[in-house]
A protein has these predicted regions:
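Conserved beta-hairpin
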Residues: 37-60
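Acidic, Ser/Thr- and proline-rich intrinsically disordered linker/docking segments
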Residues: 2-27, 36, 59-125
Length: 125
């Protein structure tokens, strides 16, 4: 069901071991993965030091953008839930000193956006 959810744009939880293996080349020594979510090919990872956003691009997904955001740099975030006619939810994250959100992720109508919001709140506050 996780594969189907991913295709539909729903975020699904992935194991911390899987996320750690995926990010082995960029994790610091002693840095622990606390939670991870997969959205189609993208990954949102919460470590004990930072938020890591992996954006796999292109047809094959070989080109990858990795954003590393220290929690202390996150000034605010917002969650816009899906409505009756608007089927997408949206997560926005602002970085200190920025007027526009540095991160904007779209989710299909599902409950996983609340889990991601809860993890953000736990690490940023």
């Amino acid at each position: 069901m996780g594969f189907i959810n991913g295709l539909l744009g729903n975020a699904s939880t992935i194991s911390t071991a899987e996320a750690k293996a995926e990010l082995a080349r960029i994790l610091l020594e002693g840095e622990n993965v606390n939670a991870a979510f997969k959205l189609v090919r993208d990954i949102i990872v919460f470590t004990d030091k930072r938020l890591i956003l992996v954006d796999k691009q292109g047809l094959t997904g070989k080109k990858t953008e990795i954003q590393s955001i220290p929690y202390k740099s996150i000034s605010r975030f917002s969650v816009e839930t899906a409505g009756r006619f608007d089927l997408d939810s949206e997560l926005k994250i602002w970085i200190s000193g920025a007027e526009l959100p540095a991160v904007s992720k779209q989710f299909k109508k599902d409950e996983s956006i609340y889990d991601i919001q809860k993890a953000l709140a736990a690490f940023c506050m």
